[in-house]
């Protein structure tokens, strides 16, 4: 895939994270920009005694030139847009982002399944304060037992919690709408077993590190799932 589309190794193409942060940009431009920043910052971040003043000046100048050259070429940051929109107007009906790019689907490993997220702020039921962030996620194609239940809903949950933290709000409800919902033939027995489990453990609680100030600074260790009780695993085969 990467060779065919002349993309960096490991790239998924025009999908999810890339589309969220660099909507409309060319991947090659973004990758060249990132590699240039890494090169120049390597010199700038080194201790003074390991980098000559000339090298440091060269790196600073190169950094400025790269930023100027790529100004306006790195696409539209949809995540910043949603956060800034809700910060300015919590009642906005335009706080949405999308992963769906019909013009670049042929250059994605898989066209985005969870396609659009809409964020709605509602009042707190107790105080009446407008500070509860809800999310409505639309999914164009739903592998229900595997994709939706074990990945897509978690993604929407994490987005809701992280954006709420940026806005000083509380996470509220998550709504999911799906089209083309399906169960693959090689998942029917496993799904039947899953549905037979009528008594589920209590729901766990997701806690985020309150010291993280920027949504871009979260790391794996900043998420804590409390009270998770796992039932015996069910092995699903990946449908190809």
Give short role names for the model-derived ranges.
Residues 1-240:
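Terminal, non-catalytic protein-protein interaction segments that mediate quaternary/complex assembly
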């Amino acid at each position: 895939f990467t060779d065919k589309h002349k993309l960096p190794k490991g790239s998924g193409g025009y999908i999810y994270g890339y589309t969220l942060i660099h909507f409309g940009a060319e991947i090659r431009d973004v990758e060249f920009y990132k590699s240039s920043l890494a090169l120049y910052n390597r010199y700038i971040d080194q201790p003074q005694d390991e980098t000559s003043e000339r090298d440091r000046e060269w790196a600073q100048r190169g950094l400025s030139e790269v930023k100027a050259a790529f100004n306006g070429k790195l696409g539209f940051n949809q995540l910043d847009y949603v956060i800034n929109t809700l910060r300015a107007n919590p009642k906005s009906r335009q706080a949405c982002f999308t992963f769906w790019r019909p013009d670049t689907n042929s250059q994605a490993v898989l066209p985005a399944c969870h396609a659009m997220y809409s964020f709605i702020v509602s009042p707190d039921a107790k105080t009446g304060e407008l500070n509860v962030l809800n999310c409505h996620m639309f999914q164009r194609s739903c592998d229900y037992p595997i994709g939706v239940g074990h990945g897509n809903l978690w993604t929407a949950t994490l987005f809701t919690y992280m954006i709420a933290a940026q806005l000083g709000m509380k996470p509220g409800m998550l709504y999911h709408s799906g089209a083309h919902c399906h169960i693959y033939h090689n998942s029917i027995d496993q799904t039947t077993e899953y549905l037979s489990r009528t008594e589920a453990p209590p729901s766990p609680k997701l806690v985020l590190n309150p010291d993280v100030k920027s949504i871009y600074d979260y790391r794996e260790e900043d998420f804590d799932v409390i009270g998770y009780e796992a039932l015996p695993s069910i092995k699903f085969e990946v449908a190809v």
